[in-house]
Each structure stands twice: as structure tokens, then as C-alpha cells.
């Protein structure tokens, strides 16, 4: 079998040949087991597999090479057996009957029935062989489907012994098992042809304008879905950034208002002190005394010291940058002020507060 002659690819041909080889090996093993079950010494059982253009010619060649005296072979497949069948039709069996050596006894069986026999004839009287005993039991074991007198015999009909009958039935069963396997291989071939046909139809559909349009439409739908999903993720991130920005802006405004209030109070107190000094008052009212305590917004909530580098965290509060990073590095995942989980670890410099702290420190060395 070649790719050009069969229309199959080389890999498919190899697979079919491998399946056939496996089937042949299984059949030979069954033959081997039948021989062993019938008492044949295992060393006397020889299994061989040959490839030939003519099966009948090769069977005859094996008979001559191995000096075979008894041969049981299938006459035809079970599906070809008909009631009242008395003549063989396969070329293989007919060729063996005509060309096998005269000393070989041949029994042709089909579907459990004896179809034809050919007794061996011996030219030397000393080696004369009577097949009556070996053929006696086959008449009772392999009765033709249409009656006892249906089978054609070259000589007087006889029957196989019980063991030979079982062997014949086993060999016939294996022969038809081989046929079944061949049918399975043909079915696989038909299935492959059907798949190839469907593939060609599908390719033709895709090559048509409507098929191409449908494919392009589906691809466009998939791209739009991916873009929409990415856009939704980007919108969600922007909304989160806006929310954080609003919170930071509110905190910034609160700090500015506090600083303005403290500035106004400081200016007012300073003006009162100046007026008191100008009047020459020796004593200054207690409420005029300038507090040397820093404003609470200048104090880091973590270290309780005046901040040098204030930064706004994700919770909206201002911390000393180094102190807050140290807090995070030691496992702090929640806000020191709200005790809520921090959304991120980002810090934003609070430039206004840092400027105010710098001015205050210059006034209070």
C-alpha cells in the first residue's frame, strides 16, 4: 500500500499496517494456545508470519516445506456461507485443494460445517495411511447446515476426532476474527474519509464571503469585549485616584485653615504685646503671654515630635516620612490614627505644613 495508490497519508498507512500486524500476532497467539490446550508440546508449536501476493500459493509452499500431513482451513467467510453449500468458491481454498501434495489430508470448514474433504494418498505401501479413524468423528461434529449429505468429498467422508474438531473450530474462529479486524480497519478508513470530507466542506465555507464575514465579525466582537473590559478597569482606577485626591485636598485645606487661625492669633497677640510695651506696662496679662508649645498639627502622631519632613498618607493624616516608613517596615498595615487598613503605602509631601513648621521653628529657636 502506497500513498499514491491508496489516497492516504504515509502516517495513516503506517497506522493501518501496525493495526494489521497486531491483529495477526493476536491470531497466532490464539492458535498457539489452542495447540497447547490440545496437548501439543510447546517446543513443537511454530508461529510464523509471511507476506505474499497469493495466499494459496504460500500455503501450498508451507505444506511442502514442513511436510504437513493434515490441514484444516476455512473455506469461506461466515457471511458468505449459504444453506446447502457443497462447493468452495474462494480461489485460495481451491488452489490449495488442487496443488497440495497428495499425501496431505485437507478439511475445509465454514461456520462450524464441513464443506469439503480431500484424503491424502500414499504411493508406498509401507507408509500407507488410513484416514478413516481421523475422519470418523467429523461427520457428527461438523454437520452441513442443510443436512448430513451436503458436503462434497473427493473420497469417502470421515470425521475429525474430538481434539481435531476443537482445533478446527478454534482455527475457523480465529480466521473470522481476522476478517472482523479487517472490517474494523475498513470502517476506520471510511470514518477518516468522512472526516476529511467534513474538513474540506468547512474550509470551503470559510473561504466563501459569508464565512469570512462571520469570522471577522466574531473576532471584532471579541476585541470589543476586551477593550471594554480594559476601559472599565481603567475607569475604576481613575475613580480610586480621584477619591484619594479629594481626601488629600480636604486634609490640605483643613491644615491650611488651622495654620491661618494660629497665624491670626499670633499676630493678634503680638500686636497686643507691642501696645502694652509702648504704654510702658510692666506686667503683661496672662492671656497675652505667647505660648512656646508647638501647634498640635506640627506633631507627628507616631513619634510625638515636631515633624521635619511631613507627608500625607493614604488615611489622610500627616506623618513624619521616616517614622511612617518605619511603621510600615515593622508590619504596620493599618492607619496609626484610624486603625483601618491602608489602601496603599504612598506618601505625598505636605509642603504647606513644612513651610509653616519651618517659620515656627525660626521664631522659637
Swiss-Prot record:
Record domain U-box: where: 293-365
Coiled-coil positions: 176-281
KW Transferase (keyword) present: yes
Record SUPFAM superfamilies: RING/U-box (SSF57850)
Any Gene Ontology biological process: protein ubiquitination
Catalytic reaction(s) noted: S-ubiquitinyl-[E2 ubiquitin-conjugating enzyme]-L-cysteine + [acceptor protein]-L-lysine = [E2 ubiquitin-conjugating enzyme]-L-cysteine + N(6)-ubiquitinyl-[acceptor protein]-L-lysine
Pathway assignment: Protein modification; protein ubiquitination
A Gene Ontology molecular function term of the record: ubiquitin-protein transferase activity
Keywords: Coiled coil, Transferase, Ubl conjugation pathway
InterPro entries attached to this UniProt entry: U-box_ubiquitin_ligases, Ubox_domain, Znf_RING/FYVE/PHD
The keyword Transferase belongs to this UniProt entry's keyword annotation: yes
Enzyme Commission identifier(s): 2.3.2.27
Known function: Functions as an E3 ubiquitin ligase.
Official protein name in the record: U-box domain-containing protein 56
Naturally occurring in which organism (per UniProt): Arabidopsis thaliana (Mouse-ear cress)
Top-level taxonomy: Eukaryota, Viridiplantae, Streptophyta, Embryophyta, Tracheophyta
Gene name, Swiss-Prot/TrEMBL: PUB56
Amino acid at each position: 500500500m502506497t500513498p499514491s495508490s491508496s489516497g492516504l497519508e504515509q502516517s495513516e498507512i503506517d497506522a493501518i499496517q501496525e493495526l494489521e500486524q497486531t491483529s495477526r500476532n493476536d491470531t497466532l497467539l490464539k492458535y498457539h494456545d489452542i495447540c497447547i490446550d490440545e496437548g501439543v508440546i510447546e517446543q513443537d508449536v511454530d508461529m510464523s508470519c509471511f507476506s505474499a501476493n497469493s495466499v494459496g500459493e504460500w500455503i501450498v509452499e508451507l505444506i511442502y516445506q514442513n511436510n504437513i500431513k493434515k490441514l484444516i482451513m476455512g473455506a469461506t467467510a461466515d457471511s458468505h456461507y449459504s444453506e446447502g453449500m457443497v462447493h468452495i468458491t474462494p480461489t485460495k481454498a481451491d488452489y490449495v485443494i488442487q496443488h497440495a501434495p497428495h499425501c496431505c489430508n485437507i478439511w475445509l470448514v465454514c461456520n462450524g460445517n464441513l464443506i469439503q474433504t480431500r484424503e491424502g494418498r500414499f504411493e508406498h505401501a509401507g507408509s500407507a495411511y488410513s484416514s478413516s479413524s481421523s475422519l470418523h468423528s467429523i461427520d457428527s461434529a461438523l454437520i452441513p447446515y442443510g443436512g448430513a449429505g451436503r458436503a462434497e468429498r473427493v473420497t469417502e467422508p470421515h470425521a475429525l476426532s474430538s481434539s481435531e474438531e476443537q482445533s478446527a473450530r478454534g482455527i475457523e474462529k480465529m480466521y473470522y476474527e481476522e476478517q472482523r479486524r479487517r472490517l474494523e480497519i475498513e470502517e476506520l478508513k471510511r470514518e477518516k474519509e468522512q472526516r476529511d470530507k467534513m474538513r474540506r466542506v468547512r474550509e470551503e465555507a470559510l473561504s466563501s464571503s459569508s464565512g469570512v464575514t462571520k469570522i471577522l465579525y466574531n473576532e471584532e466582537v471579541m476585541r470589543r469585549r476586551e477593550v471594554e473590559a480594559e476601559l472599565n478597569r481603567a475607569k475604576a482606577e481613575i475613580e480610586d485616584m480621584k477619591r484619594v485626591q479629594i481626601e488629600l485636598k480636604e486634609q490640605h485645606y483643613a491644615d491650611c485653615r488651622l495654620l491661618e487661625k494660629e497665624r491670626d492669633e499670633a499676630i493678634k497677640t503680638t500686636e497686643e504685646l507691642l501696645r502694652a510695651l509702648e504704654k510702658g506696662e510692666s506686667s503683661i496679662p496672662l492671656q497675652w503671654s505667647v505660648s512656646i508649645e508647638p501647634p498640635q498639627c506640627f506633631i507627628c502622631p507616631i513619634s510625638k515630635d515636631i515633624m521635619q519632613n511631613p507627608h500625607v498618607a493614604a488615611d489622610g493624616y500627616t506623618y513624619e516620612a521616616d517614622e511612617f516608613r518605619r511603621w510600615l517596615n515593622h508590619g504596620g498595615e493599618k492607619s496609626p490614627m484610624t486603625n483601618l487598613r491602608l489602601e496603599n503605602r504612598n506618601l505625598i509631601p505636605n509642603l504647606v505644613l513644612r513651610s509653616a513648621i519651618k517659620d515656627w521653628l525660626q521664631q522659637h529657636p
